[in-house]
C-alpha cells in the first residue's frame, strides 16, 4: 500500500491495475486503518479521475450482493434516480418521491439508497416512514419489481464488505476530509440499471459523473445540477433557476446543456 500512497503523493493517476489493488486493500479487514486513511487522503489531494472512480466502483460492486435482476423478464427500461446530497438546503427527498412517478410511466425503478447522512431524509428514511420495509433480500426486491415495477435496495444490506472501511471513514469525516466514498454512493447500485439520473452538489462535477456512468455501462445517463433563484446549488433539476444537464451513455457521446423552467412553459 505504501507504493500506491507514494504514487498518489506525486500526483500521478492510478492505472486500472493499481485501482484494483487499492480497492481490494481498502476492503481488506486485515489492512491497518492508518494506511487506508493515508491512501484515501492522498487520492483526495490528487483528485480522483473519472476512470479511477469507475474502477473503484467496479471492484466494490464485485463484493456487493447481486440481486440477480437478470432472472426477471421486465417490460420497461430499468432506471435509478438519486443524488449525491451535500447541497445543505434541507430539501425533502425529491428522488425518492419521484421513483413512484417514474414507475407509473412504465419504467422499472431500481432505487438504491441509504439513510440520510447530509440530509434529514435519506431514501431509506422516507420509505420507512411510509411503512415500507427497506431491507428486503434479493428475492423480495425482485418480487417488488415484478409486481409493482419499483423496488428498493438498502445499501448496507447489499454492501457488507464496506464494514472494513467504517472506522476509517468516520475518522476522516471527523477531520473534515472528503474521500472517494463521499462521491460514489449514487454509483454503487448492485442491480446495474440501464438508465440513471444523478443529481450532483457541484456544478463542475456534472461532466465527470456522466462519463463515470458511461464507463459503468449505463445505456443512458444524466448528471444534473440546479440552482435556486438566488444562485444556491441544488443536486436536483431546479424549478427555480437554471439546471446543467450532462448526458452520456453507451450509445451517445457527452452532451452538455443548460435548461430553465421557462423552456418548459413554467414561470418562476
Predicted regions: what is each one?
Residues 39, 98, 209:
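Aromatic/hydrophobic pocket-lining residues that form π-stacking "cages" and hydrophobic walls in ligand
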Residues 10-17, 51-57, 81-83, 97-102, ...:
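Short, mixed-charge, low-aromatic patches
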Residues 1-90, 105:
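Acidic, glycine/proline-rich low-complexity segments that act as flexible tails and inter-domain linkers
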Residues 7, 62-65, 69-72, 91, ...:
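Glycine-rich anion-binding loops and their surrounding alpha/beta cores
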Residues 1, 12-19, 32, 36, ...:
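Generic structural signal for well-ordered, non-membrane alpha-helical segments
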Residues 80-83, 87-145:
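A generic, well-ordered mixed alpha/beta core segment in the N-terminal half of proteins
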Residues 35-36, 109-112, 223:
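Short beta-strand segments at enzyme active-site cores
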Residues 44, 114-115, 193-197:
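Conserved short-loop catalytic and cofactor-binding motifs
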Amino acid at each position: 500500500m505504501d507504493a500506491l500512497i507514494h504514487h498518489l503523493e506525486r500526483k500521478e493517476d492510478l492505472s486500472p491495475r493499481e485501482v484494483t489493488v487499492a480497492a481490494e486493500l481498502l476492503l481488506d479487514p486485515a489492512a491497518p486503518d492508518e494506511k487506508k486513511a493515508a491512501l484515501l487522503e492522498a487520492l483526495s489531494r490528487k483528485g480522483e479521475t473519472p476512470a479511477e472512480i469507475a474502477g473503484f466502483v467496479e471492484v466494490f460492486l464485485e463484493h456487493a450482493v447481486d440481486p440477480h435482476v437478470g432472472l426477471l423478464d421486465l417490460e420497461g427500461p430499468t432506471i435509478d434516480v438519486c443524488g449525491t446530497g451535500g447541497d445543505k438546503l434541507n430539501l425533502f427527498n425529491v428522488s425518492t418521491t419521484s421513483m413512484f412517478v417514474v414507475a407509473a410511466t412504465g419504467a422499472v425503478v431500481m432505487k438504491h439508497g441509504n439513510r440520510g447522512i447530509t440530509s434529514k431524509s435519506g431514501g431509506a428514511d422516507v420509505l420507512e416512514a411510509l411503512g415500507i420495509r427497506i431491507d428486503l433480500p434479493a428475492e423480495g426486491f425482485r418480487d417488488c419489481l415484478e409486481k409493482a415495477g419499483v423496488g428498493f435496495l438498502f445499501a448496507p444490506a447489499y454492501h457488507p464488505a464496506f464494514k472494513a472501511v467504517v472506522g476509517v471513514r468516520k475518522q476522516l469525516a471527523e477531520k473534515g476530509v472528503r474521500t472517494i466514498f463521499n462521491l460514489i454512493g449514487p454509483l454503487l447500485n448492485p442491480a446495474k440499471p440501464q438508465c440513471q439520473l444523478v443529481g450532483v452538489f457541484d456544478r463542475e462535477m456534472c461532466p465527470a459523473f456522466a462519463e463515470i456512468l458511461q464507463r459503468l455501462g449505463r445505456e443512458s445517463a444524466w448528471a444534473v445540477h440546479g440552482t435556486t433563484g438566488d444562485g444556491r446549488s441544488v443536486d436536483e433539476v431546479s424549478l427555480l433557476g437554471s439546471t446543467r444537464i450532462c448526458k452520456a451513455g453507451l450509445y451517445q457521446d457527452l452532451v452538455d446543456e443548460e435548461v430553465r423552467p421557462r423552456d418548459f412553459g413554467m414561470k418562476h
